């Protein structure tokens, strides 16, 4: 897809999210019940007024087939709903809901996603998405693969350890203002980050995203309905997703062509960007994305701390959209980019451009 100015106007009108290191007192249904209720109540809608519901989660992570069916209890047992699900990050569920709204049969949609990696082994789960013949049987962990990518960038002189540390420091300082940030510190120092030992060479602990449990809920509305529900909706001006080759060996891992193309098709260059929320598993990946999106000093990056501060499998991408949307709705920014990624080494990328009026 492409710039939405030739399509039906759709906006984010309400968001709710929560992330923590370990969800020890509630399960996924209880977590999402609160988030979905908060999301609906903030704009005064009931489930009867929601035309479509779409969720994103992982059966592999939950360890149970069709696990998302249980989480539908958080939406409510009644009334019956028009519902769909993607085994992907919630950002891709939002794309499906956006397409549904384009058809014109409904005016509102609820999107939510969640993950509880503390209950299992995220490195084993993510290994199953690799090439089933040559790579997955070796069970390489996601951080080791990301470390190979970082080493390629360093050896080619495209990034430095200093730039990686600066990116990690930015995340921790920005995250200090975000109650959902699991790893944050106003007092973090560049010297301390540089002196950290590598845990997956060349990545230090601060270079790797902080795994967190959590979830996110978003309500979309079209046209006049959006204006009636929200004083300042965050309009989706463009949304697109692209994918690179599944085979790591045929890709240039120092780049992300799919991220570049998705941003271009979404209309990144139509106006200035006040904010960018980008989704990367490592500081090196954030640097790749900043280059692919050609972000300059006028664009503030990851004011929430990004996924380096809190990374919830299946929800981090949707949370990036919610972070941009919430700042537009509150009037803090006028235009922003939200990015979500899936697969190893930035294989598949979604870009959403949001604007206020």
In which residue ranges do the predicted regions lie?
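Generic N-terminal amphipathic, Lys/Arg-enriched alpha-helix
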Residues: 8-24
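N-terminal leader/propeptide and maturation segments of large enzyme subunits in energy/redox metabolism
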Residues: 140-189
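Claisen-condensing/thiolase-fold acyl-transfer catalytic domains that form or cleave C-C bonds
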Residues: 2-9, 29, 33-34, 40, ...
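Short, well-ordered, mixed-charge alpha-helical segments that flank or form enzyme active sites
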Residues: 117-121, 173-178, 345-346
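Short, contiguous, pocket-lining structural segments
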Residues: 138-145, 156, 163, 185, ...
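Signal peptide-proximal N-terminal region
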Residues: 38-49
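Flexible glycine-/small-residue-enriched beta->alpha junction loops
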Residues: 109-157
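Flexible, glycine/charged-enriched surface loops at secondary-structure junctions
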Residues: 47-48, 159-165, 178-183, 232-233, ...
């Amino acid at each position: 897809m492409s710039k939405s100015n030739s399509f039906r106007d759709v906006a984010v009108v309400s968001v709710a999210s929560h992330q923590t290191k370990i969800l020890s007192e509630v399960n996924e249904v209880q977590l999402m019940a609160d988030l979905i209720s908060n999301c609906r109540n903030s704009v005064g809608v009931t489930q009867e007024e929601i035309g479509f519901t779409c969720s994103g989660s992982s059966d592999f992570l939950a360890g149970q087939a069709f696990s998302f069916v249980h989480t539908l209890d958080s939406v409510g047992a009644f009334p019956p709903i028009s519902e769909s699900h993607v085994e992907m990050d919630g950002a891709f569920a939002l794309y499906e809901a956006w397409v549904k709204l384009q058809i014109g049969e409904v005016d509102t949609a609820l999107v939510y996603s969640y993950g509880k990696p503390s209950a299992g082994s995220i490195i084993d789960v993510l290994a199953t998405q690799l090439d089933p013949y040559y790579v997955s049987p070796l069970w390489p962990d996601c951080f080791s693969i990301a470390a190979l990518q970082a080493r390629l960038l360093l050896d080619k002189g495209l990034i430095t350890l200093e730039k990686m540390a600066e990116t990690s420091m930015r995340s921790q300082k920005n995250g200090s203002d975000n109650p959902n940030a699991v790893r944050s510190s106003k007092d973090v120092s560049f010297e301390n980050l540089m002196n950290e030992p590598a845990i997956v060479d060349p990545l230090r602990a601060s270079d790797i995203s902080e795994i967190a449990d959590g979830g996110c809920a978003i309500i979309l509305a079209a046209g006049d309905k959006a204006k009636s529900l929200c004083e300042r909706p965050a309009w989706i001006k463009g949304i697109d997703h692209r994918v690179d080759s599944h085979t790591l060996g045929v890709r240039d891992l120092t780049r992300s062509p799919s991220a570049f193309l998705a941003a271009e098709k979404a209309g990144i260059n139509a106006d200035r960007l006040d904010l960018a929320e980008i989704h990367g598993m490592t500081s090196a990946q954030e640097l790749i994305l900043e280059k692919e999106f050609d972000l300059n000093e006028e664009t503030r990056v990851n004011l929430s701390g990004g996924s380096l501060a809190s990374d919830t499998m299946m929800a981090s991408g949707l949370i990036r959209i919610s972070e941009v949307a919430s700042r537009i709705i509150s009037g803090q920014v006028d235009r922003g980019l939200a990015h979500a990624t899936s697969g190893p080494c930035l294989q598949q990328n979604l870009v959403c451009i949001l604007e206020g009026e």
